[in-house]
From Swiss-Prot:
Its main location: cytoplasm. It is found in: Cytoplasm. The keyword Oxidoreductase does not apply. Binds 1 zinc ion. Keywords: Cytoplasm, Endonuclease, Hydrolase, Metal-binding, Nuclease, Ribosome biogenesis, rRNA processing, Zinc. One of its GO terms (cellular component) is cytoplasm. Zn(2+) binds at H113, H117, H123. This is Endoribonuclease YbeY.
Amino acid sequence: MIKEELNLWAEGVEFKHWDAYYNFILSVLNFLCIEEYELSVVLCNNEYIQKLNSAFRQKSEPTDVLSFNYLEENGQINHKIQGDLIISLEYLEFSSLEFNVEMYDELQRNTIHGILHLIGYTHETNDFQNEEMLVIQEKVLRETRRVF
């Protein structure tokens, strides 16, 4: 039986665009040919993500997105997801100013980024021209863009 479950919620932040965001995530999963998924996405503040970053990565600082994959990683790209994404809207507000982009563009980009990690992609650098994962990320963003 194919499982298709997507849960969204907020921790310590207000978010008003749940329907649009839900549909955006479904479009990303469809674009990436994800056959089966159990995915939870938490939109949060810096305090919430910093606690998780400290507990699981031993980094006592906030970050943009954390991904937690509950499937066995085999070094290959998987077309199933069982995991969680934690995304700090507070952090994205800062980075959107730094990169001179809309905050919702950063939300979409970081959501795609986290999903790519959950299906097995990794990157060593932040080179958007040459890192396969980041090239794919930007392609998916272009193709599924502007839902807010």
